[in-house]
Amino acid sequence: MTPAALAELLRNTAVDVLASRDLDTSVIPAAVTVERPRNPEHGDYATNIAMQVAKKAGVAPRDLAGWLAEALTGQDGIDSVEVAGPGFLNLRLAADAQGQILREVLDATDAYGRGAKYQGLKVNLEFVSANPTGPVHLGGTRWAAVGDALGRTLEAQGAEVTREYYFNDAGAQIDRFVRSLIAAARGEAAPEDGYGGAYIGEIANQVLEAEPTALDLPEAERHETFRRIGVGLMFDEVKRSLHDFGVDFDVYFHEDSLHTSGAVEKSVEQLKESGHLYFADGAWWLRSTEFGDDKDRVLIKSDGTTAYIAGDVAYLRDKRNRGFDLCIYMLGADHHGYIPRLKAAAAAFDDDPDAVEVLIGQMVNLVKDGKPVRMSKRAGTVLRLEDLVDAVGVDAARYSLIRSSVDSALDIDLDLISKRSNENPVFYVQYAHARLSSLQRNAASLGIDRGSVADADLSLLTHEREGDLIRTLGEYPRVVRSAAELREPHRIARYLEDLASAYHKFYDACRVLQPGDDQATPLTIARLQLCEAARQVLANGLGLLGVSAPEQM
């Protein structure tokens, strides 16, 4: 019995108990919480459901807990129930209930942990969206790893996810980038407000290879040539580096298209017509304070040009017009102000502000030999995606970027994540999978066939470490669901570390294959089934993170 199944049993039992006493059943929450107690002597799981609803139902918590304990005792999968403290319920599962967890894992295989929480929900997930003026920096790299993992996690809960990259090919930064390319092509220093680094010279040379007479063209034509070829080359490099990192997008949306198509102008006119814009100080302002923003925002400047938010408004309208139920934006730490302004923009169009979610991520720092790594040799100013991958590889880079909450700044110790030891979290998890794969190969080499889980006597798995491992496997579906609901894929990484720890402790305490034995006992078969279930869940979890599950290391 998984925690999810136990929670459902508790809820149904609570409904029956209250209904049988003519008490209000509406006080029972839609989802009942069950947790593993810190002290194993308190049982396999605990819940505070009686304390949570007793007051609303008009009864004493311990009385309700006692009624629930009586009703649960003897039900399938329940070994014992006891009331503790002010009204906690401590539950022990029957041996067969633990075996049921293994059967669920091995019957579902790759599908174990998947659910239908967001079945049918169309999600637009926009992440990275770095300016096309340089390589993907470490902040963008963090979003690449986390965003891709979040997309996989939402899909595991039934969502239809479109991964989108917003290509900022409009605005002043493009002009500075182009002027930097032209200066490099001439052998001159970068403009004061331009971009430096070896990559600028490399792209400038590629522009000249594609268009040898580019520098001889009239100024406007020269600028457009360097813009067209240079921005295209930079964007191709960004896409290539992300692809090599295991991240691909379904849509690359060009900001410039919002202006050339008239989408920005149309959005502004609609807001004028609805009365949500007003004219003051020579500019047009969005009445965003009416929708919870801390100040009104300029959409059309006094010189007649559009402010950046005008493009954001049009872009949000475009997403919603494409049929997305939920638009998630993953932005850097300097974008906190986008949360109220995007929600205000939605409300101004009589749209649902809750259809917009903004996730804010903090910075990433690299540390080597105990000191910060400051400079990229090629970018000249900032560390790139490739710098991290070159140092530690794709798997270690992705896992290290995902395993911590994006709410906090992240320091990545390059020395630590390069180690082949249990100190290195990604090695620790991958090694557990490789060890489990090796165990199954060794069994096969001895002629031992674990057979079907339906034929195994799983009631033999009575050791404390076996129980710990089984219960940890049972937690996985709930972890995936909460990671999707909270938009926190790092929960999956931390769970995998707990699972690897539970497996290593089991392996040290419980011999699976006896040296020299080629005859499998029923206990051997049961333990091989447990090991295969653990391997399967590790593989499933690593897959959601976009990290490989090696069969040998």
UniProtKB/Swiss-Prot annotation:
Keyword Aminoacyl-tRNA synthetase: yes
InterPro entries: aa-tRNA-synth_I_CS (IPR001412), Arg-tRNA-ligase (IPR001278), Arg-tRNA-synth_N (IPR005148), Arg-tRNA-synth_N_sf (IPR036695), ArgRS_core (IPR035684), DALR_anticod-bd (IPR008909), Rossmann-like_a/b/a_fold (IPR014729), tRNAsynth_Ia_anticodon-bd (IPR009080)
GO CC, alphabetical: cytoplasm
GO biological process, one term: arginyl-tRNA aminoacylation
Source superkingdom: Bacteria
Any one GO molecular function term: arginine-tRNA ligase activity
Catalytic activity annotation: tRNA(Arg) + L-arginine + ATP = L-arginyl-tRNA(Arg) + AMP + diphosphate
Record carries keyword Ligase: yes
Location of the motif 'HIGH' region: 130-140
Keyword field: Aminoacyl-tRNA synthetase, ATP-binding, Cytoplasm, Ligase, Nucleotide-binding, Protein biosynthesis
EC numbers for this chain: 6.1.1.19
Cell location: Cytoplasm
A Pfam match: Arg_tRNA_synt_N
UniProt enzyme class: ligase
Subunit architecture: Monomer.
Entry similarity comment: Belongs to the class-I aminoacyl-tRNA synthetase family.
UniProt-recorded name of the protein: Arginine--tRNA ligase
Organism: Saccharopolyspora erythraea (strain ATCC 11635 / DSM 40517 / JCM 4748 / NBRC 13426 / NCIMB 8594 / NRRL 2338)
The gene coding this protein: argS
